[in-house]
């Protein structure tokens, strides 16, 4: 049997692609080295932010707005919502380039964003403390996603639609010829007209020339009472300290507030190097500078987890065909800010498999930007 599309890596983007391509009527095989959702990539830990006024650059805004529509559609397939509209407050110095990008994106795309000075931030959310020179940009239509529930839902819907699934089975090699692609796995060989490589952190095992640097990251839950919950209108947040360090976090659930540091981490070169939470001495205290400054009422660290970023050199996505092989799409380099886009990236991959032109300008995400 020859598939229309074989997906290598069925985490966030791959799971979405499997569903959307199967729904479009294609013969699809989803593969993964583990059983998605799993703990080996970047999608675990229950929740991920979704921001619309994008501080990483306005080139992402059309993608995230389409992603939002798809997330809301996906939520209709569950009793529990996948998207939670908590609002997101972006905090930082008034001269922060990140916040300038947020404001610019909001203006360009007429997004619902409110700017607050330091006094207004602390009046609305007394739990938050900020220096006098800080501002907040509040995205009231943004919030967070239940990441593992999303992947479970896509995998289930794809299977129900007739998608073949081969999990706990690593892909070991790809071979291109004039008639398509042969995908070698521990279970045997499979043939496809087109392939999506969405293998996350360890994509270089299949495509060694990709400029991807795996980074070990951690996030943790800290003791927090009901003041920090959505019942008290406490939002999700991003925060930049005066030294430039960037943090993100979520409203407390079950008396625990999740927070992580976006920058930093440990460079790694194999899965074995991604040690569990607390294996690095700084893991449990990484968020302390932010908590002491911005959220002084938060309590002790309860538990945490490690994940992996697949960083590109400029921390922008890579969405491109494999050089010399127009039948193989690569989605990688999501650099720790990709989950919110998983729905639209999966749709882009499904369009690719159908021979459709992308609905977005993907030029900023091409591989050739690293050689120009």
Curated annotation (Swiss-Prot):
The modification S-8alpha-FAD cysteine is found at residue 307. Its EC number is 1.5.3.-. One of its GO terms (cellular component) is cytosol. It catalyses: N(alpha)-methyl-L-tryptophan + O2 + H2O = L-tryptophan + formaldehyde + H2O2. The keyword Flavoprotein applies. FAD binds at residues 4-34. It is an enzyme of class 1 (oxidoreductase). InterPro entries: FAD-dep_OxRdtase (IPR006076), FAD/NAD-bd_sf (IPR036188), Me_Trp_Oxase_MTOX (IPR023493), MTOX (IPR045170). This is N-methyl-L-tryptophan oxidase. It comes from Citrobacter koseri (strain ATCC BAA-895 / CDC 4225-83 / SGSC4696). The lineage of its organism: Bacteria, Pseudomonadati, Pseudomonadota, Gammaproteobacteria, Enterobacterales. The gene is solA.
């Amino acid at each position: 049997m020859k598939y229309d599309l074989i997906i290598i890596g069925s985490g966030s983007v791959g799971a979405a692609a499997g569903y959307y391509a199967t729904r479009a009527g294609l013969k699809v095989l989803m593969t993964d080295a583990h059983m998605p959702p799993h703990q080996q990539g970047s999608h675990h830990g229950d929740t991920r932010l979704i921001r619309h006024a994008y501080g990483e650059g306005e080139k992402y805004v059309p993608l995230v707005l389409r992603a939002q529509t798809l997330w809301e559609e996906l939520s209709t397939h569950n009793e529990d919502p996948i998207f939670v509209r908590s609002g997101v407050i972006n905090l930082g110095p008034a001269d922060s380039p990140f916040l300038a990008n947020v404001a610019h994106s909001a203006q360009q795309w007429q997004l619902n964003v409110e700017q607050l000075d330091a006094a207004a931030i602390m009046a609305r959310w007394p739990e938050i403390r900020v220096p006098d020179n800080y501002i907040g940009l509040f995205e009231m239509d943004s919030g967070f996603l239940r990441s593992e529930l999303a992947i479970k839902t896509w995998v289930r819907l794809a299977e129900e639609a007739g998608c073949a699934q081969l999990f706990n089975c690593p892909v070991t090699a790809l071979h291109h010829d004039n008639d398509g692609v042969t995908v070698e796995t521990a279970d045997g060989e499979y043939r496809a007209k087109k392939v999506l490589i969405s293998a996350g952190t360890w994509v270089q095992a299949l495509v060694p020339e990709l400029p991807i640097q795996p980074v070990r990251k951690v996030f943790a839950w800290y003791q927090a009472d009901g003041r920090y919950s959505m019942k008290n209108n406490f939002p999700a947040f991003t925060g930049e300290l005066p030294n430039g360090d960037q943090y993100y976090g979520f409203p407390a659930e079950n008396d625990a507030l999740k927070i992580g540091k976006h920058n930093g981490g440990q460079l790694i070169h194999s899965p074995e190097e991604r040690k569990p939470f607390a294996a690095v001495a700084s893991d449990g205290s990484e968020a302390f500078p932010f908590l002491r400054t911005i959220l002084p009422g938060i309590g002790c660290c309860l538990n945490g987890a490690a994940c992996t970023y697949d960083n590109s050199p400029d921390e922008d996505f890579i969405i491109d065909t494999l050089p010399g092989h127009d039948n193989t799409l690569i989605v990688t380099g999501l650099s720790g800010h990709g989950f919110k886009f998983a729905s639209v990236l999966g749709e882009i991959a499904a369009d690719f498999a159908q021979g459709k032109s992308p609905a977005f300008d993907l030029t900023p995400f091409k591989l050739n930007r690293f050689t120009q």
